[in-house]
């Protein structure tokens, strides 16, 4: 199949061949990857390459001169190319996200991972260590080393001969062996260098103490199960933050990313440093490092292949994640080094674990200092670049292009139809390996739309709404890092709990758009325009204005004063509830709404300065009122001249801001109660008969009715006796 991919990739270079014709089937030799020429057979001398048409059975003959080029041309001519455009539905998009190292997120990760390790990890201290040595090995050690085993006190080391260890109680003990020969105990450490390595040390106790600080040792009861399942336990703790049907898939995803990290480190000798503590480095296991050894089955011993350069720092989530990566089981590495760079893989693991833990501990809300804006355009650009720049995908025929929704051009990519299945699966793996750098811009999954606009392929992270709604408990203004061609964006994040109602969410978005337009226009001075319209390809809204400073200050004031924003939400939600008849939808108990307003504000400093000067001059009487009003009117259109200049040079006079609201929570049960749809308290009706008395009355009434209509009931014995009596009477 790789050879086929090579032909398809080459075929894209010839621009003179039509690309979108239906394919009747490439030659069989190409599909199987086994042309006679490539097998070194005598067909090269014959000069004919035969292939069977997969649909019609027609035989294709090609002459030897330029045979490979002819095959490529046929491939270009016949293979239909599909166009895929990334689309971010509401449930996969964050209107804000968290910074790496945000304090709230750090605490949530530490809390969760400590919970993961609880009752599964041993307390690594020298008092829990016992060395396995023969008498000969012990006596061969220098006196200074032997003294550490024979002295009395807390810093004394323990040792025993193999025969004594087999019958000893080793619960919560770590056995240090000088080699992998002999018995492997539930918790076993392999001392580097064996007996000779120990003899070279100045202090075995000090060496052991420093080494134990760098490893995570599973308890004997957990043994191998711990090192293979810490990620599973993490998923169990964070199950509320995951889409249940996706748990198994994303569990494997996280494990595969970590195994890719291990392979990259062990095969290429790369390292990962903690983001917060660069001196703490995860590297390949060295000759001077203690290794954990555990039994896999009955005979196979697995050794840790990674080591930390220094002790991890307490309270650091990044160090904690490095510890857990260190103790995953070793797997036989593939011959091929992973194509995704190591730093990108670790960023994906770090962000994925952080997102789950944040949802579990913080319910998706963090302090204002940890908030970061997202950007749809940047995420889309990075996503497309990841796909079209992958060498293997390019060799399979993937190439960049553009698609249009109305008049809007969007980034897209070509996929050969005959390889679409395998290509889309590889894209899925590739995109998820880049989860970290994409998540920092708002990505939480994506849908690939085909040229007809249908959602053809879903790339799902498995994270649910608790991790796709990241907001503070206060209004916040942050820098908007963007590559968008849109100057002004209005993003809404709404969710209904416990049942998701896409219809209701869409109605909420549209109602908020209408109310925002109404409230912002109210009170604007003459000459300032403002209009909102939905973006063609996603759930965002764009808005246009001829005075971005005036609108920005108006919107910021609306959030700051809170009451106008409250009125906006109340009016919008009341319309939705009436239209959707949500008052009687018992499946929805809570509605949550948050908004992000993203703007490129041109000339804000000059605008504010002008307003301050004008206000002072008007108050002092030095500037006539009519002149002041004229200046204000001119300021409304000041943006147009500013933009004309800035389009030629870099926009040094523009600042990109993102205003993020609090998450507003509406209790629908309380709304229903207040509106009289349901009673706040159940009214108890006192009956003259108790429950048992009423049941007895019904039974008696039923017996009376049936007895009156059908006579008294007779038992089977009575009926037999009556029949016998009747028979005797007839005989007489």
UniProtKB/Swiss-Prot annotation:
Residues 719-732 have a biased composition (Acidic residues). Residues 13-74, 706-732 are annotated as: Disordered. Residues 13-23, 31-56 have a biased composition (Polar residues). It comes from the Viruses. This is Non-structural protein 4.
